């Protein structure tokens, strides 16, 4: 019998921002930031979101897990300091939890505004707020090339088929609004995923990520009042040719009813190459 979120304690009902295809079935212009951050191609759906603390979620089965990590850092405004001091912390925490042989943290986002700041004329994001569109950061197509640029050809040759991309997400202060929600990987079938590709002006591929359509049976979870010592670790991609469904986790921020006047969420997320 399939697991039911509704049967658990601490369930909330919230609207999630899913992707809506064009009426003719064609894909939208993925370079248009309103497709990712604005109101274009938006399908707002009411869903049940369970309490992640209610179960022992596992990376290998569910695609995500909740782990303890008390950081020595409290100020994340200096990007170079984050790279120098926080990256090693996160890498060690991931290695300890997963048994990975090598972890390379390669970028991060600090989110401390209520909404992303869009400059639609320049087609850029001026500041980063909670990402409310349901998505998966990485989709097949251009991933190996991007990783090669960051980690080098020697890494790709040595660890081919053995690495994953994971996100490590934690609050900078206790979350009171716009929490992160993640979906049990197996509850989101491949047919609900749309590979959206962004291209540079010269026509080369810039980014490939999954948008997510609403579907029956998606199982969503979040951490109520998530504390600074609680880190959500979730998988976005696997280089293993026999990759499983738990290797891509849909996620998004969502509006928690009744919290709109609470302090703005502050969080830090690190993306890492994890070698097994």
From Swiss-Prot:
TM stretches of this protein: none
The GO terms describing molecular function are: oxidoreductase activity
Per UniProt, which keywords does this protein have? Oxidoreductase
Recorded catalytic activity of this chain's protein:
2-[(1R,8S,14R,15R)-11-hydroxy-14,15-bis[(6E)-oct-6-en-1-yl]-3,5,9-trioxo-4,10-dioxatetracyclo[9.4.0.0(2,6).0(8,12)]pentadeca-2(6),12-dien-8-yl]acetate + 3 2-oxoglutarate + 3 O2 = phomoidride A + 3 succinate + 3 CO2 + H2O
Determine the domain of life of the protein's source.
Answer: Eukaryota
Application in biotech and industry reads: Phomoidrides A and B (also known as CP-225,917 and CP-263,114) are potent inhibitors of Ras farnesyltransferase and squalene synthase. CP-225,917 and CP-263,114 inhibit Ras farnesyl transferase from rat brain with IC(50) values of 6 uM and 20 uoM, respectively. CP-225,917 inhibits squalene synthase with an IC(50) value of 43 uM and CP-263,114 with an IC(50) of 160 uM.
Per the UniProt entry, the Enzyme Commission number(s) are 1.-.-.-
Q: Tell me the pathway.
A: Secondary metabolite biosynthesis
Which function does this protein serve?
Alpha-ketoglutarate-dependent dioxygenase; part of the gene cluster that mediates the biosynthesis of the antihypercholesterolemic agents phomoidrides which are dimeric anhydrides. Within the pathway, phiK is responsible for the iterative oxidation necessary to convert prephomoidride to phomoidride A. The pathway begins with the highly reducing polyketide synthase phiA that catalyzes the formation of a C12-fatty acyl-ACP, starting from one acetate and 5 malonate units. The hydrolase phiM is involved in the release of the C12-fatty acyl chain from phiA.
Q: Which family does it belong to?
A: Belongs to the asaB hydroxylase/desaturase family.
Please report the name of this protein according to its UniProt entry.
Alpha-ketoglutarate-dependent dioxygenase phiK
Where does this protein come from, organism-wise?
A: Fungal sp. (strain ATCC 74256)
The major lineage groups are:
Eukaryota, Fungi
